């Protein structure tokens, strides 16, 4: 790991089949992050299976089942360097039922690349991903208008997609000045690492140049430690090893830490990153660590690790601002869907709908409405059905956003305004 460069977590978002995996594979390939012989092996495998051209995406699809289906599933962490930054890609899958990955993934991202196919334009998932990125606090968006090779590198096709995406960004109040558009072909490699002769009409940066120009994220090291647990492993000779990404603060060996809502604590013995032992971990670092006196059955995915003397909040109830994206009917008090917050998934009841908000102005449109529906924004009071650690978004924004899922889809997303602790 390059210690001397700042780190960025990059989400790659967009509609299914618009070329996200191929783009990620191409970025890794162009930055020398994938050895040539591995690419060759993938190429042979892809051709044998009649999927020639998928070799870059194969870099991302490590799971045999995914390869067979031609679909990318779990979030894959991949790393590459530019001159300025050390990037971890959070490859966010695009299939309908993978949106919750997108939520746990995007909340971990500093910035995002939105991939939109030039021959297909803005699609429902494009809208949903942009909306989620906005709600979850991604500020800088690089839009790769991809598959330019399929529209013969036609500038008018490119401009039409740019207009369409800009309209979408304005709808969700994303500052369009913070959006950079680049015509690309991940498959052919146009404008990924260097300017392409096929788009002589375009004089902007390549994708890697645009990534290199991103502002440096300011790590929330001053905030108290918050580290949501993704998995818990038992490793022989070490013991129980929780794994997760530091969202805020610093994890040091020797720290006394507490896991909430499981409510167990202990001393950090070792911290490992990329299979190397490190003295401490900072925001953005994906780490495994071992805590004295904490067993595998004491903690689970969805717990949050924090200092024993400033433990993560556990909500009895919380007030939140939500935006309903798609719900087949209406949402009323008593509705109990599943909330996805950081790595936790907990059924929560909307106890009351306190205010309806006008999404365009942010003003209160109605007090105590009877119901809300798709397109509405509202302030609601929520009661988790089992213990949930969540923070107010103005105190620890990294742990203050969530998605609401029901019926196999994301129905709403939101952020926590205040927590009434248990």
Curated annotation (Swiss-Prot):
CC annotations in GO: cytoplasm
One MF annotation (Gene Ontology) recorded for this entry: GTP binding
Sequence segments annotated as region (G1): 14-21
Residues that bind GTP: 14-21, 91-95, 146-149
Residue ranges, annotated region (G4): 146-149
Catalysed reaction, written as an equation: GTP + H2O = GDP + phosphate + H(+)
Record region (G5): 185-187
UniProt xrefs under InterPro entries: EFTu-like_2, G_TR_CS, GTP-eEF1A_C, P-loop_NTPase, Small_GTP-bd, T_Tr_GTP-bd_dom, TRAFAC_GTPase_members, Transl_B-barrel_sf
Function, in words: GTP hydrolase that promotes the GTP-dependent binding of aminoacyl-tRNA to the A-site of ribosomes during protein biosynthesis.
G2: annotated segments: 70-74
Key words, A-Z: Cytoplasm, Elongation factor, GTP-binding, Hydrolase, Magnesium, Metal-binding, Nucleotide-binding, Protein biosynthesis
Family membership: Belongs to the TRAFAC class translation factor GTPase superfamily. Classic translation factor GTPase family. EF-Tu/EF-1A subfamily.
EC numbers on record: 3.6.5.3
Highest taxon above the source species: Archaea
UniProt-annotated binding residues for Mg(2+): 21
Positions of region (G3): 91-94
Record-linked Pfam families: GTP-eEF1A_C, GTP_EFTU, GTP_EFTU_D2
Subcellular location: Cytoplasm
Sequence ranges assigned to domain tr-type G in this UniProt record: 5-221
Name of protein: Elongation factor 1-alpha
């Amino acid at each position: 790991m390059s210690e001397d460069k700042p780190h960025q977590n990059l989400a790659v978002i967009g509609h299914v089949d618009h070329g996200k995996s191929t783009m990620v594979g191409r970025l890794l390939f162009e930055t020398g992050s994938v050895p040539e012989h591995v690419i060759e092996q993938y190429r042979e495998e892809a051709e044998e299976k009649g999927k020639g051209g998928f070799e870059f995406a194969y870099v991302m699809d490590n799971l045999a089942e995914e390869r067979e289906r031609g679909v990318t599933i779990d979030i894959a962490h991949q790393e590459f360097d530019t001159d300025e930054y050390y990037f971890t890609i959070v490859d966010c899958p695009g299939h309908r039922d993978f949106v919750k990955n997108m939520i746990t993934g995007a909340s971990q991202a500093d910035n995002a690349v939105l991939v939109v196919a030039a021959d297909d334009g803005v699609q429902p998932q494009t809208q949903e991903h942009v909306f989620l990125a906005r709600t979850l606090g991604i500020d800088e968006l690089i839009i790769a208008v991809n598959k330019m090779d399929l529209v013969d590198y036609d500038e008018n096709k490119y401009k039409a997609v740019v207009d369409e995406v800009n309209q979408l960004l304005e709808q969700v109040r994303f500052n369009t000045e913070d959006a950079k558009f680049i015509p690309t072909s991940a498959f052919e490699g146009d404008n990924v690492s260097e300017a392409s002769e096929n788009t002589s009409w375009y004089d902007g940066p390549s994708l890697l140049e645009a990534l290199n120009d991103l502002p440096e994220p300011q790590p929330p090291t001053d905030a108290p430690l918050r580290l949501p647990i993704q998995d818990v492993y038992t490793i022989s000779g070490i013991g129980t090893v929780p794994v997760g990404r530091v969202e805020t603060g610093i994890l040091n060996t020797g720290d006394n830490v507490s896991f909430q809502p499981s409510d167990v604590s202990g001393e950090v013995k070792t911290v490992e990153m990329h299979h190397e032992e490190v003295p401490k971990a900072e925001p953005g670092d994906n780490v495994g660590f071992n805590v004295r006196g904490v067993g595998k059955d004491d903690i689970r995915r969805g717990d949050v690790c924090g200092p024993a003397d400033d433990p993560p909040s556990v909500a009895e109830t919380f007030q939140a601002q939500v935006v309903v994206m798609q719900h087949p009917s209406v949402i009323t008090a008593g509705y109990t869907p599943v909330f996805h917050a950081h790595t936790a998934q907990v059924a929560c009841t909307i106890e009351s709908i306190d205010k309806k908000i006008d999404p365009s102005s942010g003003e209160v449109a109605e007090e105590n409405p009877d119901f809300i529906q798709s397109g509405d924004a509202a302030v609601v009071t929520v009661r988790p059905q089992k213990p949930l650690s969540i923070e107010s978004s103005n105190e620890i924004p990294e742990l203050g956003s969530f998605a609401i899922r029901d019926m196999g889809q994301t129905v709403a997303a939101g952020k926590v305004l205040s927590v009434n602790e248990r």
